[in-house]
């Protein structure tokens, strides 16, 4: 399971002109699911994201988590995080989970985040989305539950 995590001042997502999710201060998470992912990957990434100390404290040091600052999490499904661009000019997405599995694990990931006592908003799985965000920092991190990077 892979995630791009961005610290944001605010973020929202629309599908077919309708807003499906919005947060103020918090983190925007683009989530990709791999074919071998499961509950361990969900637990690892959800706990990591909620507890990452990427928000400034009173001394302006990145020392606080999204939970500690009362922020929200906006989760967007993003199978392209498993795109392989090493050969040719068109990415291969063979490394991504099949849609049925990815949909189930995406939903379980969102539910696990909600158990972490943070407000969670989402896009819509397997839909074209417009994501609007205001980066804060910017702070952008790449996470992989298999610790590839």
UniProtKB/Swiss-Prot annotation:
Write down the Pfam families for this protein, in alphabetical order.
Tyr_Deacylase
Q: Which UniProt keywords apply?
A: Cytoplasm, Hydrolase, RNA-binding, tRNA-binding
Q: Where in the cell is it found?
A: Cytoplasm
Query: Origin, by domain of life?
Result: Bacteria
Q: Cellular component per GO? A: cytoplasm
- CDD domains referenced in this protein's UniProt entry, alphabetically: Dtyr_deacylase
ATP-binding as UniProt keyword: no
The EC number(s) given in the record are 3.1.1.96
Q: GO biological process annotations for this chain's record?
A: D-amino acid catabolic process
InterPro entries hit by this protein = Daa-tRNA_deacyls_DTD, DTD-like_sf
Main location as per UniProt: cytoplasm
Q: Which GO terms describe its molecular function?
A: D-tyrosyl-tRNA(Tyr) deacylase activity; Gly-tRNA(Ala) deacylase activity; Ser(Gly)-tRNA(Ala) hydrolase activity; tRNA binding
Q: Where is this motif: Gly-cisPro motif, important for rejection of L-amino acids?
A: 137-138
Q: Which reactions is this enzyme annotated as catalysing?
A: glycyl-tRNA(Ala) + H2O = tRNA(Ala) + glycine + H(+); a D-aminoacyl-tRNA + H2O = a tRNA + a D-alpha-amino acid + H(+)
Instruction: Tell me if Disulfide bond is a UniProt keyword of this record.
Output: no
Quaternary state and interactors: Homodimer.
> What PANTHER family does the entry give?
D-AMINOACYL-TRNA DEACYLASE 1, D-TYROSYL-TRNA TYR DEACYLASE
Q: What's the entry's take on its domains?
A: A Gly-cisPro motif from one monomer fits into the active site of the other monomer to allow specific chiral rejection of L-amino acids.
Q: What does this protein do?
A: An aminoacyl-tRNA editing enzyme that deacylates mischarged D-aminoacyl-tRNAs. Also deacylates mischarged glycyl-tRNA(Ala), protecting cells against glycine mischarging by AlaRS. Acts via tRNA-based rather than protein-based catalysis; rejects L-amino acids rather than detecting D-amino acids in the active site. By recycling D-aminoacyl-tRNA to D-amino acids and free tRNA molecules, this enzyme counteracts the toxicity associated with the formation of D-aminoacyl-tRNA entities in vivo and helps enforce protein L-homochirality.
Family as reported in the entry's similarity comment: Belongs to the DTD family.
Protein name as annotated: D-aminoacyl-tRNA deacylase
Q: Tell me the organism.
A: Syntrophobacter fumaroxidans (strain DSM 10017 / MPOB)
Which gene is this protein's source? Answer: dtd
